[in-house]
A protein has these predicted regions:
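Extended hydrophobic/aromatic segments used for targeting, binding, or gating
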Residues: 75-118
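Blade-level signature of beta-propeller repeat domains, shared across WD40, Kelch, NHL, RCC1
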Residues: 110-143
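Signature of short aromatic-glycine-proline-rich micro-motifs recurring in repeat-based ectodomains
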Residues: 1, 33-55, 102-121
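Hard-cation-handling environments
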Residues: 1-3, 8-19, 24, 56
Length: 143
């Protein structure tokens, strides 16, 4: 049995083994974002946040999906083998940070909530400031 722990402060996540109470080394999500992608640079003590997480199993693989608040994105990792976490993909959520019309005049907050159906590949991201929802479907769900 495992648990997924996301750390908003340093922008990382870990897998906790609930039988041995040991955790994997932290994975910093910002390191897997494409060049030029929006990251949180407001403070040196705060990184791009894996805000909300969901876990989905498909064909013997376990995937961790996380909403990245300041990056307006959903990022996916294959965590089937907790000792060998593999970056899978990242997709933009909402209208995009460069076009965010946040009432506060700041575009630093995007994808806040996340919901994933456990079997059909549908994922929803609640985009906080713009008041929208993005629907994703996994490639395997469209096959």
């Amino acid at each position: 049995d495992y648990a997924l722990i996301s750390n908003e402060r340093n922008g990382s996540f870990q897998i906790l083994d609930l039988t041995t109470f040991t955790a994997t080394d932290p994975v910093t999500v910002e390191n897997d974002l494409p060049d030029g992608w929006k990251v949180d640079g407001r403070k040196s003590t705060k990184r791009t946040e894996p805000e909300e997480a969901a876990v989905v199993e498909k064909d013997g693989h376990i995937y961790a999906l996380m909403a990245l608040q300041e990056s307006h994105a959903v990022i996916v990792y294959d965590v089937t083998d907790p000792a060998n976490i593999i970056f899978d993909s990242v997709s933009e959520a909402g209208i995009g940070w460069e076009a965010d019309n946040a009432p506060e005049g700041s575009s630093d907050i995007g994808s806040e909530g996340l919901g994933a159906h456990p079997t059909n590949g549908m994922v929803f991201s609640a985009n906080e400031r713009e008041g929208s929802v993005t629907m994703f479907s996994a490639a395997w769900a469209r096959e």
